[in-house]
A protein has these predicted regions:
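Hydrophobic positions on the alpha1 helix immediately C-terminal to the Walker A/P-loop
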Residues: 11, 15
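Structural recognition of the conserved hydrophobic beta-strand(s) that form the central parallel beta-sheet
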Residues: 67, 104-110, 131, 140
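P-loop (Walker A) phosphate-binding loop of NTP-binding proteins
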Residues: 3
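Short regulatory helix/loop adjacent to the ATP-binding pocket of P-loop NTPases
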Residues: 112-128, 144-145
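Short glycine-rich substrate-engagement loop in P-loop NTPases that contacts/grips substrate
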Residues: 31-64
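Conserved glycine(s) of the Walker
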Residues: 7
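Interdomain hinge/linker elements that couple catalytic modules in large macromolecular machines
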Residues: 134-184
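Conserved Walker B catalytic segment
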Residues: 67, 72-106
Length: 184
């Protein structure tokens, strides 16, 4: 969990994926669904997500990994088997998938709609929360290098949002931050 644009999706979908692949995980054993992408919109439905993952995970002794990005965009759907009005949620889907012994599940999200406390309550004793924060000065400096005092001045002014580092000019950095803060 963490604030928007703090690097959660990058850490999971790029760095952790790379780590898994470099350590022998087959690419086809890593399933990624990004609920903010139109191509994955159908998997916002918890029943569709469970169906898709269960079709891909084999009982062949191999380890599988599920990455779900932007979980706060998931849908609640009517329960077709129970007419009490209760909906099927992503909690139900993840609890179902969690029962698969050779599947590790990783979920990112950044919306107050799904508070980390609620998630930890739903999955008490069966999950770990990793909080992702903007870069510390040490992390920032390891990326920019150079004069430490100048780097600190820039860090104090622009902050530690990771994508600020990729903006080439002061104006581009300010535009990025202005847009980011207006979205929050």
């Amino acid at each position: 969990t963490g604030i928007r644009r703090s690097g959660k999706s990058y850490l999971l979908g790029t760095l952790f994926r790379k780590y898994l692949l470099e350590n022998g995980t087959k690419p086809e054993n890593i399933f990624s669904y990004a609920f903010d992408l139109a191509s994955d919109i159908r998997y916002r439905n918890p029943l569709e997500l469970v169906k898709a993952v269960r079709e891909r995970v084999r009982t062949d002794g191999e380890q599988y990994y599920l990455f779900v990005d932007e979980i706060q965009m998931s849908d609640e759907v009517p329960n077709p088997y129970n007419k009490d009005g209760k909906k099927i949620t992503f909690y139900d889907a993840l609890n179902d998938l969690r029962s698969m012994p050779n599947l590790d599940i990783y979920v990112t999200g950044s919306n107050s709609k799904m508070l980390s406390a609620d998630i930890l309550t739903q999955f008490r004793g069966r999950s770990d929360e990793i909080r992702v924060h903007p870069l510390s000065f040490a992390e920032y400096y390891s990326a920019v290098g150079g004069d430490k005092y100048e780097a600190f001045d820039n860090y104090a002014f622009y902050g530690g949002m990771p994508l600020v580092l990729s903006r080439p000019t002061d104006k581009a950095k300010m535009n990025y931050l202005t847009t980011l803060f207006s979205e929050v």
